[in-house]
Amino acid sequence: MKGDSRHLNEEEGASGYEECIIVNGNFSDQSSDTKDAPSPPVLEAICTEPVCTPETRGRRSSSRLSKREVSSLLNYTQDMTGDGDRDDEVDDGNGSDILMPKLTRETKDTRTRSESPAVRTRHSNGTSSLERQRASPRITRGRQGRHHVQEYPVEFPATRSRRRRASSSASTPWSSPASVDFMEEVTPKSVSTPSVDLSQDGDQEGMDTTQVDAESRDGDSTEYQDDKEFGIGDLVWGKIKGFSWWPAMVVSWKATSKRQAMPGMRWVQWFGDGKFSEISADKLVALGLFSQHFNLATFNKLVSYRKAMYHTLEKARVRAGKTFSSSPGESLEDQLKPMLEWAHGGFKPTGIEGLKPNKKQPVVNKSKVRRSDSRNLEPRRRENKSRRRTTNDSAASESPPPKRLKTNSYGGKDRGEDEESRERMASEVTNNKGNLEDRCLSCGKKNPVSFHPLFEGGLCQSCRDRFLELFYMYDEDGYQSYCTVCCEGRELLLCSNTSCCRCFCVECLEVLVGAGTAEDAKLQEPWSCYMCLPQRCHGVLRRRKDWNMRLQDFFTTDPDLEEFEPPKLYPAIPAAKRRPIRVLSLFDGIATGYLVLKELGIKVEKYIASEVCAESIAVGTVKHEGQIKYVNDVRKITKKNIEEWGPFDLVIGGSPCNDLSNVNPARKGLYEGTGRLFFEFYHLLNYTRPKEGDNRPFFWMFENVVAMKVNDKKDISRFLACNPVMIDAIKVSAAHRARYFWGNLPGMNRPVMASKNDKLELQDCLEFSRTAKLKKVQTITTKSNSIRQGKNQLFPVVMNGKDDVLWCTELERIFGFPAHYTDVSNMGRGARQKLLGRSWSVPVIRHLFAPLKDYFACE
């Protein structure tokens, strides 16, 4: 993973975070009731459920750009950067691939002072430090109420990544005004356009109006008289340590309702979220130096950055007297095209002089402001989970870095209070005045509600929820997306061990291990993380002896999960009375369920499969010689169909995870998009259940990703009336693949044990004369770049002295399939990997299905 920034990767057909609008009922789009009315299965599921929570009403609508529109939007930028030769595949979530350009131009000044030449940082943007927080459109994890400054739009950016996440600006385009989250944005009336309505949303009550006009400017003639550049009203690029350049405007201290700026400092208001920051004048440059500081990676990735660019250039356009033609209904991207060309061309004809403020013009954007103190910034940090990582492209073009950091916006909030609390905790524990188990290891709060699974210490409610959601989220390079200790962090150090996927944030190292530890770690190469080192204790960071068991317990014994009645237990059937099994498989994929049943020797009387992918159907039909009966799209299956095909003894399925996975920036949640397909499984499951008085054994199983929102997980559990178990395929295969499984299969929560035939190491899966460079690989997804491993994106295999990717037959063995299982209908390598990336791990399903041998006839 080399480049100026690195973006979150998808974990399972989903990708990168952008602007998610589902807000647990607090903010939804304003589309019509008819449009947002749930499908009959959803209505049935909701009506069947006695409790209808606000989460069920979250809505989000989105639109997508065509490839042609995306290409036209980015062509001029590629020309200026001189790149575009190498493109990464970007999955828009609908099965189409979009080619996005990579940036080889080095983003200026993206390194922090603390970095050594051997260390490359990966920045993600979205927020800044301290003042630079965006309000999260989703309120979860028991955080404090949402109070945020609502001013001129801005969000702190990330610098450019050469390896793009699966979802980019192309796949997550600017939504229609009715559905875009503008909770922190109000467009000045003077710069509004008829084509794109960027006015404030309806969630801006109780805000003050801040207007600074020419009179206030004249009255501040003595402000900023320190022989430094930039006065009130100047349009600038600002730089905060750890983040890339972001557009802003110099304002008077009176506009901030704070104190006067210190000598050599300037108050600036960031475009995008309207926050104010006091920043050194030496870290400001004129907006006229546009090409040197414009960040193509962030523009392609972040809606907030495009919004900031729009308002910045609209302000510049007004000052320069520049006009652009537009047509009604024109998208934001279309309006930005000529604006960006104008900016990259030097703001001709007026040039930089035309951008200077006119004393007759307002010098602060006429935007509504909601005041809040730092305590109310807490929920804001979660908005941009699309955390971008930045690296230095020029170095990347020469050779892979020996060591990299990744920097993200998730920890960009003001963590001052948390760090002070953790410092006190560390001091007390060091002086034997406190117990780690009595404090939250992530934030330092007292009276934790749960234990930390890896290290001695606890977790408070909000940190535990965050841990549940994000611990199994991985980036494109295979590393965890967030810190192993706190599941956030702004700057993350990556373990150098090839088989390790852990990363640790600078904050945790400095507070828990010791001051200066992070700087020392940056200079070490290789650097082994605290999960790999043989020594367990480092400062107050003490690895648990039984961390592997604790980790399993953490995801299966959630104290906040609703207690359900234990599933009905069926006594084992005597061998003489067992009969072949009858199966209904929804979202069947490549017939993993049928394959496992046959491997276990269970006789299958009928296997009815619902699948819409033609390639998957081809695999199942050819490899199982027509023994599988394929039926309609799951949405078209009726109760009458179930009665005709049934009865069934086993119902299995795993609905698409695109709109549930946290790694998807455009995810729509459980109640929209593909997320609502869960309810198709739910209502068909109810149709297949035995009638009252029928005591025949009946089993079912539902699967989905671990990296989903806690509320979605709870809703699924509530409808299915049971809690899930979490199983990671790493225990029985050569690849990570953590999944939740709901169901009533006997012994679902028993320990996972590998069989003698399971291929536990990569070398066991390779063809002759090929050598594995590591024992295990990270989660293999539908993306081709998920094959490369580690922070340097290394090829996992060596053959004849040359590095190589995994072959399709080797991928099949990793998943537990027979070699050439997907080799049908002339499918290419990419298509075969996509089928495998969406499939189940055969050893895991074998582990779950094995108890069925006590109930059904075997061969």
UniProtKB/Swiss-Prot annotation:
One of its GO terms (molecular function) is DNA binding. The keyword Glycoprotein does not apply. Activated by binding to the regulatory factor DNMT3L. Residues 428-560 form the ADD domain. Changing S277P: Prevents accumulation in pericentric heterochromatin. Changing A609T: Significantly reduces activity. The PWWP domain is essential for targeting to pericentric heterochromatin. This is DNA (cytosine-5)-methyltransferase 3B. The lineage of its organism: Eukaryota, Metazoa, Chordata, Craniata, Vertebrata. The gene is Dnmt3b.
